[in-house]
Amino acid sequence: MKSRLFIISQYLLPHHLLSRLAGCIAECRVRWFKNAFTAWFAKRYQVNMSEALVEDLSAYEHFNAFFTRALKPGARPLDETPGAILCPADGAVSQLGPIEHGRIFQAKGHGFSAQELLGGDPAMAAPFMGGEFATIYLSPKDYHRVHMPLAGTLREMVYVPGRLFSVNQTTAENVPELFARNERVVCLFDTERGPMAVVLVGAMIVASIETVWAGLVTPPKRELKTFRYDEASRTPIHLEKGAELGRFKLGSTAIVLFGPEQVKWAESLGAGSAVRMGQQLAAPVQA
């Protein structure tokens, strides 16, 4: 009954208004308030501050600075296995596996369209048909920066407007097409394993999504917008494996897509597996 009421509330709540309010609170610089709120959050979610570059909670100018905190050098060593595809973020594997008939598995009884996830462009989605996906959920306690699984050159970025349903096991099992309905930023790269998409999916009270090349991705109008980076007039944007790609200001989910016969997921990983940025997520399929 509680789960049913929670799902009903997800459809009734003003998602974007709540997220804007959360954003205002997260950017508040009133010292006593931001210190108290940050301390409560760190204790409530058992955030490990010993690995943070700045351990003193009161040193952060606002909650968002704490939430997107940098880690100490070496806190997330990169797997050195030749050809290893790295996990892009801390969190847990929600699902991973093949993209079958153009659809990505969400939870028992639910899936969603890979084409819709990527913004609806059939040409962008085509290279991923029959490929592989991994969905990584970032919990409140996690490090909320997203990094490159492989070195790549940015081809395009797509802002896709949408709802801001909460992202958790209950919504994954009860909200159809959850990740293809929420607001998201699609980043398409050319890599040694062919096209790679990294999709940053928003959720309720996710105040914003940033990328290292564009900053806050907040178009003036909430409408689909594509940014091309492969035009001759632009300086190429190349990011090395393990480099920061973007970050969530109050986070959610990162989804990685590869084409067919390119990667093989680590056998030790499955739905619910805890992961850390930099560990091996997959190995390359040998040609």
Swiss-Prot record:
It comes from Pseudomonas putida (strain ATCC 700007 / DSM 6899 / JCM 31910 / BCRC 17059 / LMG 24140 / F1). The record marks 251-252 as: Cleavage (non-hydrolytic). Belongs to the phosphatidylserine decarboxylase family. PSD-B subfamily. Prokaryotic type I sub-subfamily. GO terms for cellular component: plasma membrane. GO terms for biological process: phosphatidylethanolamine biosynthetic process. NCBIfam families: PS_decarb. It is a peripheral membrane protein. This is Phosphatidylserine decarboxylase proenzyme. The keyword Lipid biosynthesis applies. Heterodimer of a large membrane-associated beta subunit and a small pyruvoyl-containing alpha subunit. It is found in: Cell membrane. Binds 1 pyruvoyl group covalently per subunit. The modification Pyruvic acid (Ser) is found at residue 252. PANTHER family: PHOSPHATIDYLSERINE DECARBOXYLASE, PHOSPHATIDYLSERINE DECARBOXYLASE PROENZYME, MITOCHONDRIAL. The active site is at 90 (charge relay system), 147 (charge relay system), 252 (charge relay system), 252 (schiff-base intermediate with substrate). It is an enzyme of class 4 (lyase). Is synthesized initially as an inactive proenzyme. Formation of the active enzyme involves a self-maturation process in which the active site pyruvoyl group is generated from an internal serine residue via an autocatalytic post-translational modification. Two non-identical subunits are generated from the proenzyme in this reaction, and the pyruvate is formed at the N-terminus of the alpha chain, which is derived from the carboxyl end of the proenzyme. Catalyzes the formation of phosphatidylethanolamine (PtdEtn) from phosphatidylserine (PtdSer). Its EC number is 4.1.1.65. It catalyses: a 1,2-diacyl-sn-glycero-3-phospho-L-serine + H(+) = a 1,2-diacyl-sn-glycero-3-phosphoethanolamine + CO2. GO terms for molecular function: phosphatidylserine decarboxylase activity. It comes from the Bacteria. Its cofactor is pyruvate.
